[in-house]
Regions:
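Conserved phosphate/ATP/ADP-binding segment of small-molecule kinases
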Residues: 110-184
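Conserved N-terminal subdomain of the carbohydrate kinase-like
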Residues: 19-102, 106
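Short, small-residue alpha-helix embedded
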Residues: 15, 135-136, 194-218
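Charged C-terminal helix
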Residues: 45, 219-259
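Nucleotide and nucleotide-moiety/phosphate-recognizing core
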Residues: 79-87, 175, 183, 220
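Phosphate-handling active-site elements
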Residues: 22-26, 185, 211-225
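N-terminal basic/disordered segments at the start of proteins
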Residues: 7-23
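Short pre-catalytic strand/loop immediately N-terminal to key active-site residues, enriched for Gly-Thr
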Residues: 1-6, 184-198
Length: 259
C-alpha cells in the first residue's frame, strides 16, 4: 500500500485495522504519498526492485496468514507483486483496487488498468471495488442493485474468486453486494452523515483480510468488516480540516475505559 502521513488511509489505516483485529501487521510500501485529510498533493512510486525486496524480507522471515493489496499505481508495481504472490502463495489475498482518492486525486495510472485486470485480479480471493472503481473495471454505468450484481459477476469473470461491490457512494442505504463465484450476498448498512470517511476503503479491505486470517468464512468476514467500519465512522474524532479518519480502535478504547 501507499503511505499517508496524516495517518488515516493507506498503510497507516491498514496497520491500525489489522492491530485492532488482533493481528500482527506487516507492510510493504508501494508508493510514498503526500496527503492529508484535505487531499493528495503528490506521490512517488517505489521501485519494483525495492518492492520485491520488501516482500522477500517479510515472507522469508515471518509466516503470513493474509495479504491485503492497496495502491499499485503503475504496471511495473502490479507485475512484481503478482510474481511474488505466485512465489509465496499466501492463503488469502484481498485486493482493494485503489483508483481515485476520496479527494478525487487519481492514484492508478490509466496504462495500469489493463495490467490490474490481466495480472492481479486472477490472484485475488476477494476484490473490493467501490462503484466508481467497478465502473472503470467493467466499462459500464452502475445505478441499481441489478447493475451491482452484473458488475460483480463481470469482474469475477476476469478472474477474482469473489467480488464485493460497495454501494456507499450512491446506493441509498449503503448496501454492498458480494458475489462469491456462485451466490450473491447482500449487506445493508445505515448511511452516516459524516466527513470522517478518509481511508474507509483501506480499512474495510484490511478488516476483511484480518477476519479471514482469524478463521472466519467469507460472508461473516465481510459482515464483521462492514460493522467495524460503520462503528469507526460513527465514533470518529474530528481530526483535520477535510475528510478525517475513522476511529480504528473504538472497541478497544471502550473496553479500556478510554474516553
Amino acid at each position: 500500500a501507499g503511505t499517508d502521513p496524516s495517518g488515516g488511509a493507506g498503510a497507516a489505516a491498514d496497520c491500525k485495522t489489522f492491530c485492532a483485529h488482533g493481528c500482527f501487521a506487516l507492510n510493504v510500501i508501494t508508493a510514498v504519498v503526500s496527503q492529508n485529510t484535505q487531499g493528495v498533493r503528490g506521490y512517488m512510486d517505489v521501485t519494483p526492485e525495492l518492492i520485491a525486496s520488501q516482500i522477500d524480507a517479510v515472507f522469508e522471515d515471518i509466516d503470513v496468514d493474509a495479504v491485503k493489496i492497496g495502491m499499485v499505481s503503475v504496471p511495473e508495481t502490479i507485475r512484481v507483486i503478482a510474481d511474488k504472490l505466485k512465489q509465496y502463495r499466501p492463503a488469502f489475498v484481498v485486493v482493494d483496487p485503489v483508483m481515485v482518492a476520496t479527494s478525487g486525486h487519481r492514484l492508478l495510472a490509466p496504462e495500469a488498468e489493463q495490467t490490474l485486470k490481466d495480472v492481479l485480479l486472477p490472484l485475488a480471493d476477494v476484490l473490493t471495488p467501490n462503484l466508481p472503481e467497478a465502473e472503470v473495471l467493467t466499462g459500464k454505468k452502475i445505478e441499481s442493485f441489478e447493475d451491482m450484481e452484473d458488475a460483480a459477476k463481470a469482474i469475477a469473470a476476469m478472474g477474482a474468486k469473489a467480488v464485493l461491490v460497495k454501494g456507499g457512494h450512491r446506493i441509498a442505504d449503503a448496501t454492498d453486494v458480494l458475489f462469491d463465484g456462485k451466490d450473491f450476498h447482500y449487506y445493508k448498512g445505515k448511511r452516516i452523515e459524516s466527513t470522517s470517511t478518509h481511508g474507509t476503503g483501506c480499512s474495510l479491505s484490511s478488516a476483511i483480510a484480518s477476519n479471514l486470517a482469524n478463521g472466519m468464512n467469507l460472508s461473516d468476514a465481510v459482515q464483521a468488516a462492514k460493522t467495524y467500519v460503520f462503528e469507526g465512522i460513527a465514533h470518529a474524532e474530528p481530526i483535520g480540516k477535510g475528510h478525517g479518519p475513522i476511529h480504528h480502535f473504538y472497541e478497544l478504547y471502550k473496553k479500556a475505559g478510554v474516553q
